[in-house]
Swiss-Prot record:
Belongs to the GTP-binding SRP family. SRP54 subfamily. CDD domains: SRP54_G (cd17875). Keywords: Cytoplasm, GTP-binding, Hydrolase, Nucleotide-binding, Ribonucleoprotein, RNA-binding, Signal recognition particle. It catalyses: GTP + H2O = GDP + phosphate + H(+). The lineage of its organism: Archaea, Thermoproteota, Thermoprotei, Thermoproteales, Thermoproteaceae. SUPFAM superfamilies: Domain of the SRP/SRP receptor G-proteins, P-loop containing nucleoside triphosphate hydrolases, Signal peptide-binding domain. It comes from Pyrobaculum arsenaticum (strain DSM 13514 / JCM 11321 / PZ6). It is an enzyme of class 3 (hydrolase). Its main location: cytoplasm. Composed of three domains: the N-terminal N domain, which is responsible for interactions with the ribosome, the central G domain, which binds GTP, and the C-terminal M domain, which binds the RNA and the signal sequence of the RNC. Involved in targeting and insertion of nascent membrane proteins into the cytoplasmic membrane. Binds to the hydrophobic signal sequence of the ribosome-nascent chain (RNC) as it emerges from the ribosomes. The SRP-RNC complex is then targeted to the cytoplasmic membrane where it interacts with the SRP receptor FtsY. GO terms for cellular component: signal recognition particle. This is Signal recognition particle 54 kDa protein.
Amino acid sequence: MKALTELFSKLVEKIRDVEYIDEATLQEIAREIQRTLLKADVPLDLVKTFTDNAVKRIREEKPPAGIPPREYLIYVLYEELVKLMGGEQPAEFKPTKKPYIVLLLGVEGSGKTTTSAKLARYLMKRGYKVGMVETDTIRPAAFDQLRQLAEKIGAPFYGERDGKDAVEIARRGVANLKGVDVLIIDTAGRHRNEEALLQEVKAIYDAVNPDEVVLVVDATVGKLAAAQAEAFMKYLPIHTVIITKMDSTARGGGALAAVAKTGARVKFIGVGEDVEELEPFNPRKFVARLLGMGDLDALLEKIKAVFEEEEVLEEIESGRLDLLTFKKQIDSLMKLGPLSKVFQLLPGGLAAKISEEQIELSQKNLKKWRAILSSMTMEELKNPDILNASRIRRIALGAGVTPKDVKEMLTVYENLKKMSKTLKRQMRLRMAR
């Protein structure tokens, strides 16, 4: 995802550099949006429709009070990208019967066999017993590859090293692994124009009657993903698409948009080679990360789960976070989990502005901060701006720490204060929708 994120981050930076949005500026931004989408290999017709919709909204819609036009433009860009990538509602993968049979398809080199193990691992972590069947009779290494992956994740496996009939192997696999909750059947990788192999997939489909058909697509094919999906759709229904190798190419955006255009639903993306590196695809969260907006929903859920007192929520949501509020919630902050994970959810690139050393310090020294805050007067807690060198020395002495410790805590406090202001701005946008 890094290449794709960098591509869109540059676009957002250019928009944020704009002081005033007149018609000429809007047209230049529109051209920049088009260039970015084309670099991501989004189909040309989708690029034109996307740009027309975004420009029309910017011309006609008035930003909410307190939101600069350039920030609202970024938010419009966010909403239109969500539509482009498949819409607001993420598609869920939920086995509904036992055994729930999943048939995996894909062209050669798409990462299909590895993805079958990733999907199995994903489901096993959620309590499902998963079995795996290899039906590839064309690629000799496929049997060994999937068997080794199955052993690695602890999944029952069925395959026939010297088997010749993929359809019969699939049938016997279903019969031999009856006790599982989910059965994943891997098929031979194929070129979409290879008629005989496509007929074989259809024969396996007819023989085992799968509950879900999953097409695995390599992100590097970009907009050609639509052609792959449509070719398979001529022979059997495609319920789910998994886009692999999203970590290695900027063309993944084009693949996502192209697949969404066909009506197929992307449910997962592969973000690395390890069996753990499969993520459920949520268009809204995916686009937020692309644009450097962070995962605000996840962050808000974490904060609200901890800050249960209404007046504290009001302080944070209003953008006012003083040291008294910080003191009240110092214990609750520890319930958020590792602060490094929390900061990753921050919007606007704030996470990058907080060093790893600061994050580690904040995790280790919450007790020290409580002592520092307890050494302050009520006036100092409510108005941190009055903390000069003399006051800091007195506070440090009372808390049994050094003045440097006090200053470091104040640095973390300032970063949290910035976070609360950002939350306030994003909440205004959400309320305006």
